[in-house]
Structures are given as C-alpha cells and as structure tokens.
C-alpha cells in the first residue's frame, strides 16, 4: 500500500480540527496528529487545534509529547475550565510530572 501525499485541510476547504476529529473517531490517531501539527505550525493561535492535539497524544499514549505541549499551553489555558481536565488526563499519563501535581493543590 502506498502512502498518499498529505494535502492540508485548509487547501481543500475543510476545517482541520473537524477533519482531525473524524480521524480520531476512526482511530487514525497518527493521521490526526499529522493534521493537527501542520495546522498548529501554520496557525499557532488555533487553540482548539492545540487542545485536540493534547487529546491525540493521550490516545497515542505519548506522555512526553503530552507533557511538552501542556507545559507550552499552561499560560494560555491555566485559567480556563479545560485546564483541570488537561491536568487530570496528564496525571494518568505522567503521574510524576510536576505540572500536573501542582494543579492538585
């Protein structure tokens, strides 16, 4: 089976977060990761893409990537309702990671 060339969703008139959600629904986690990473590279302020990428890292059990991205996003998300969930999930992936321990206090 040959690899299809990646064409960014925006170039096809498609919302990248929506496309990644479809990939996640069908357990195509690596494809969702590819879409979201490309989106964030080109749209660094796309917060929904960042949050969905965190979820994708969780599904891939990629604790290092999850921790790095959560650390990067802490300043933007710490006062939002999503942050408590991000830390809860983070503790399940990396219970020893200090960032997620701080949120318990």
State each model region's role:
Residues 1-31, 38-42, 64, 69-105:
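Intrinsically disordered, low-complexity, charge-biased linker/tail regions
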Residues 55-57:
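Conserved short loop/turn motifs at secondary-structure junctions
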Residues 48-49:
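Structured alpha-helical
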């Amino acid at each position: 089976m040959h690899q299809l060339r990646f064409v960014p969703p925006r170039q096809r008139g498609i919302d990248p977060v929506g496309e990644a959600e479809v990939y996640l629904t069908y357990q195509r986690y690596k494809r969702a990761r590819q879409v979201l990473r490309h989106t964030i590279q080109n749209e660094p302020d796309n917060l929904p893409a960042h949050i969905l990428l965190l979820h994708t890292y969780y599904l891939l059990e990629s604790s290092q990537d999850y921790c790095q991205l959560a650390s990067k996003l802490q300043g933007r998300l710490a006062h939002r309702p999503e942050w408590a969930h991000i830390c809860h999930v983070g503790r399940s992936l990396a219970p020893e990671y200090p960032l997620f321990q701080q949120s318990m206090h």
